[in-house]
Amino acid sequence: SVPGPMGPSGPRGLPGPPGPGPQGFQGPPGEPGEPGSGPMGPRGPPGPPGKNGDDGEAGKPGRPGERGPPGPQGARGLPGTAGLPGMKGHRGFSGLDGAKGDAGPAGPKGEPGSPGENGAPGQMGPRGLPGERGRPGASGPAGARGNDGATGAAGPPGPTGPAGPPGFPGAVGAKGEAGPQGARGSEGPQGVRGEPGPPGPAGAAGPAGNPGADGQPGAKGANGAPGIAGAPGFPGARGPSGPQGPSGPPGPKGNSGEPGAPGKGDTGAKGEPGPTGIQGPPGPAGEEGKRGARGEPGPTGLPGPPGERGGPGSRGFPGADGAGPKGPAGERGSPGPAGPKGSPGEAGRPGEAGLPGAKGLTGSPGSPGPDGKTGPPGPAGQDGRPGPPGPPGARGQAGVMGFPGPKGAAGEPGKAGERGVPGPPGAVGPAGKDGEAGAQGPPGPAGPAGERGEQGPAGPGFQGLPGPAGPPGEADLGAPGPSGARGERGFPGERGVQGPPGPAGPRGPGLQGMPGERGAAGLPGPKGDRGDAGPKGADGAPGKDGVRGLTGPIGPPGPAGAPGDKGESGPSGPAGPTGARGAPGDRGEPGPPGPAGFAGPPGADGQPGAKGEPGDAGAKGDAGPPGPAGPTGPPGPIGNVGAPGPKGARGSAGPPGATGFPGAAGRVGPPGPSGNAGPPGPPGPVGKEGGKGPRGETGPAGRPGEVGPPGPPGPGEKGSPGADGPAGAPGTPGPQGISGQRGVVGLPGQRGERGFPGLPGPSGEPGKGPPGPMGPPGLAGPPGEGREGSPGAEGSPGRDGSPGPKGDRGETGPSGPPGAPGAPGAPGPVGPAGKSGDRGETGPAGPAGPAGPAGARGPAGPQGPRGDKGETGEQGDRGIKGHRGFSGLQGPAGPPGSPGEQGPSGASGPAGPRGPPGSAGSPGKDGLNGLPGPIGPPGPRGRTGDAGPVGPPGPPGPPGPPGPP
């Protein structure tokens, strides 16, 4: 079956039933759940000091506890009795290299070594910086004035100066006579899709919600064993797409096809969902919801990252080994009073990784969290192809009478249909499956235009398919609608990526564990004291040829040297390569005004540029600084005065058009002959000292300087310590030491009496140090032995909570069956004739009527006399939106109108796309020389030039005086 044309948009439905009712009362407390496996709860308040219990039976040895922070260094103990000599221990591991000690005092200077071989000549260094600019020489004698040259041809016209400020708006002209209605122009091609606009600013945070009532605390679950490391988390949810770009201009209107026959096929299967549209701009931040009830404790988290390696603790003195027999362990005493809060110790080194424990029990699901904020509405998806109409469904139940919706746009009046004979009611068939979308039929030929029929009664039509998206309407903010029904609970989301470890919780009320095992070797000790000066070393062998040193940086410019004698001229060197163009210099002070030039002839008109496609509206650029005023161009030739035409009607201000591409540049005229140089202008005023320029880039490394003169004899100043040399080869192991004598075994000391427990000290002030790194998770303690508590009494119903935030919009429910046609309403009274309304929005394209015969073109009427200027009438009220009229026939072209008065300057339109680069302009006139710049700093002293070639022998000198006899 051929699908029919897309129907117009159906009327807006009545609003649905009101949302959910007020919040209900709090239900009775639930049954105690299974023990969870969540993290340890917060530390409770300290209990009253208990009494010392009797010694209990020997308990099982507990798990080794974590290594505690190093305690403070104790007082030095008394020397113990000499012990027996111990056995030779195993050789310990090599300790870490200690910190580099300070350099010792320099030993006596050794004998100078033999001179090394001369190194290879170094490469030529980079080109030096240009020297300072020389002082201006003395002015030469003025030359004789040359003959005046011939007058040069007029140069090309100068560039157009900047547009002047907008003039004052002129007086409102009289309303002109309405001209003949022009033919409707063809719609332009569809524009390219615009780029997404910049993201909007973040909305302000909403007010804080009222805190909710605390929920009933759950039963404390047993701590599970540390779980094994979980599998890598699923990838996170895809981030939101960028903001939706501006809609492009509407495309060309297509030909309407002939109405297809009603399809009677089976309903096809549901089509594939359309592509996801671009996400709209983020909406304003919603109000912060109230605090939800406390959820059930979650499963035990994965172990956090290992903490930073702590610094070395102070080494304590070894205590004497106890030799008493192990007594029976006492009964577990009641916990004593909480002691004073100790100062935080240094972070310990991370312990060895424990074995993976068994997987903990899965925690009970948490209570549903508060409703999330309403997300921004997504963009409208692409319209699907219309499927064949399905069979009519059963009659639905009467809905709740809703509020009257807004007045819909007036539809095209339909042709009165003939009333048919009512048939017998048919049996309601089963709902068919959704059929597959049929292929779009070819557009049919345009039929003849039909006559406009009378408006018929509203027919029992079904809701049409959604029409194409119309142009954006005016922003009339309607009243907020009622809160929608709370959506169904969504499916559980994918498991998120593991978040960063949270801050360390408060210290739990557990008992102190057993002392830990001895840790690994400590970090290297502190830097040692400076050693004594060593003996004088032997004279070293002559050193090898050193590696050529790196080119040193360019030194600071030296003082200006005295002018040297003029050297002999050497031979001319070859011409060097053309240097790169230097950076543009600072703008010089404006020179004296030159003589006025001759007015150039008007340039040839350029070819009109091709009409560019409307560009996308670009973001409004920042206002640039005002440019300098351009020179005023010569006045152009006065054009011929045109015949005055009749004054046209004042049109309404249209939207600013898109900036088109610039037209093709005109031909560049030939440059005129160079004129004679004018007389030098008077010297300008002394320029002001410019501001400090930005720091220049680091220049290339300079050439190595010449070898300086030898220094004075004797020992030089003490040099700075050299860099660390490479690590030497490991030394051979030293000789084995002699075993010491075995000492006498000391007598075991008496066991001291147990002291009384001290009173709890006052709580110390909280420390102000930075929080230490998070330590590794501790081993799970044994489960506590407690009786199951009896359920508490039923609480009284709580107060009604504050209304929660607006819930997310629920999913669109299935389309209900079409309602039965309503009874035809009584015709309303004839209303007064409405005023001429604004032009209505473009409605959906209706089926093309049969083309009517072309009417004969009427004769052109005589030109009427120009009417008097009428008085300006008062501005009328805004009219009611009228129906869109039919396109009129194209009238004859009117006589050319007189140029209208210049209207007020409109708002600057959005910046269009950047045009192609223009052609190179004609060379400008030679500018006047600016004032000489300030004398730069003296450059580095130049090196002596190479000696020139030996000159020819001079003529013989005159004979000398005779010698003495």
Swiss-Prot record:
Residues 102-118, 136-154, 202-241, 359-385, 394-413, 472-482, 569-583, 596-623, 652-668, 697-706, 718-730, 851-865, 899-932 have a biased composition (Low complexity). Residues 307-327 have a biased composition (Gly residues). Keywords: Extinct organism protein, Extracellular matrix, Glycoprotein, Hydroxylation, Phosphoprotein, Secreted. It comes from Scelidotherium sp. (strain SLP-2019) (South American ground sloth). Belongs to the fibrillar collagen family. The modification 4-hydroxyproline is found at residues 15, 18, 20, 29, 32, 35, 49, 64, 70, 79, 85, 112, 115, 121, 130, 136, 157, 166, 169, 196, 199, 211, 217, 226, 232, 235, 250, 259, 262, 273, 282, 297, 303, 312, 318, 335, 344, 350, 356, 365, 368, 377, 386, 392, 404, 413, 422, 425, 443, 460, 466, 472, 480, 492, 501, 509, 515, 524, 542, 557, 563, 584, 590, 593, 602, 608, 626, 635, 644, 656, 662, 671, 680, 683, 704, 713, 721, 730, 748, 757, 760, 766, 771, 777, 783, 791, 797, 818, 821, 824, 896, 899, 917, 932, 938, 953, 956, 959, 962, 965. This is Collagen alpha-1(I) chain. Residues 1-965 are annotated as: Disordered. Residues 52-66, 866-880 have a biased composition (Basic and acidic residues). One of its GO terms (cellular component) is extracellular region. Type I collagen is a member of group I collagen (fibrillar forming collagen).
